[in-house]
């Protein structure tokens, strides 16, 4: 399995997963997860994509995929968007369900030893706001980005669309 960012047009990026059987012949990749949602490129000087892209095998039919918000904060809380989420993907048909929202740039996914109900997720937050989260596989978890974070924006400014309140619990988040 390979996750990658696909540039659909000059200003549209989305996330795909393909797979191939390893052999001595050229690899023939088949689509596993194809989604037409995209985020727009920005022309900012510091253009970190915050794309996520970590995969974790759950069982023979499902993988998890972390998808960052690509610096488009509002997408993390939008349940109609795959961005700023962790997805459980059925590799047989590409269908997915959201297991975590309110993520900025989820980079690490790991199983917990002797536990199939939770995973461990690491996330690059804003300045001083990296997170380690224990995520339930049995319900949708909301980790609050961009409403709550213990970090600060790198430019030091307060943003209306991403206020970064310093409490997750006070705002109803994990």
Predicted regions and their residues:
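Acidic, Gly/Ser/Thr-rich repeat motifs that build Ca2+-stabilized beta-propeller blades
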Residues: 1-73, 108-125, 174
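Beta-propeller domain segments
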Residues: 62, 69-174
């Amino acid at each position: 399995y390979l996750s990658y960012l696909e540039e659909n047009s000059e200003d549209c990026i989305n996330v795909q997963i393909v797979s191939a059987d390893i052999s001595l012949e050229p690899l023939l990749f088949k689509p596993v997860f194809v989604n037409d949602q995209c985020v727009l490129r920005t022309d900012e000087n510091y253009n970190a994509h915050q794309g996520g892209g970590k995969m974790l095998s759950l069982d023979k039919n499902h993988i998890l995929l972390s998808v960052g918000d690509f610096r488009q904060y509002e997408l993390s809380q939008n349940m109609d968007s795959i961005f700023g989420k962790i997805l459980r993907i059925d590799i047989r048909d590409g269908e997915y369900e959201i297991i975590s929202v309110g993520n900025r740039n989820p980079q690490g996914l790991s199983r917990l030893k002797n536990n199939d109900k939770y995973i461990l997720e690491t996330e690059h937050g804003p300045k001083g706001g990296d997170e380690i989260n224990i995520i339930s596989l049995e319900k949708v978890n909301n980790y609050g980005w961009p409403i709550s974070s213990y970090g600060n924006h790198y430019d030091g400014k307060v943003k209306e669309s991403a206020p970064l309140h310093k409490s997750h619990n006070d705002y109803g988040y994990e």
